[in-house]
């Protein structure tokens, strides 16, 4: 649904303003989205581009669906994910791209817990090198 709405220039323009102002309400923020590093905050000090193999993503999504009592085949889920990726990469407004200064992280073999731990370590090192302080770690 979000991927289809993101194709609308009018919708994106409204969201961009909101998203750019959101971190100003706190002392920084961690934002997640397919155009956060390319459109919303192209000058962010740290950017990650997290990816995973399509089949791995489909299996993970299947597990999420099963937890809420929904049943879909891995093949059907993979087809939907592939369609979403293609749509997001090729849309005219805010396409999904990996910025040259982003740290690419393939999470095909790792868990979310490991990803979170490694990203926090990278952020802490970067902030320390910039003389900045992390206020709240979760």
Give the residues covered by each predicted segment:
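RNA pseudouridine synthases
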Residues: 1, 37-40
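ATP-dependent small-molecule kinase phosphotransfer cores
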Residues: 1-27, 55, 59, 72-92, ...
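Conserved catalytic network of the ASCE P-loop NTPase/AAA+ motor domain
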Residues: 21-24, 39-42, 94-98
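Short, well-ordered beta-strand core segments
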Residues: 29, 45-49, 102-104
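A short beta-strand-to-loop transition that corresponds to the Sensor-1 phosphate-sensing loop
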Residues: 33-35, 52
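C-terminal extensions
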Residues: 41-65
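NTP-dependent small-molecule kinase module
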Residues: 62-68, 87-138
């Amino acid at each position: 649904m979000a991927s289809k709405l993101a194709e609308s220039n009018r919708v994106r323009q409204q969201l961009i303003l909101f998203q750019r102002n959101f971190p100003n309400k706190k002392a920084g923020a961690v934002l997640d989205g397919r155009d956060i590093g390319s459109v919303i905050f192209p000058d962010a000090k740290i950017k990650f581009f997290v990816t995973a193999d399509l089949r791995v993503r489909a299996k993970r999504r299947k597990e999420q669906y099963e937890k809420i009592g929904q049943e879909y085949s891995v093949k059907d889920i993979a087809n939907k994910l592939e369609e979403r990726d293609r749509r997001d990469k090729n849309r005219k407004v805010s396409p999904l791209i990996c910025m040259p200064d982003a740290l690419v992280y393939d999470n095909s073999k790792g868990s979310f817990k490991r990803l979170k731990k490694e990203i926090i370590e990278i952020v802490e090192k970067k902030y320390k090198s910039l003389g900045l302080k992390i206020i709240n770690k979760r």
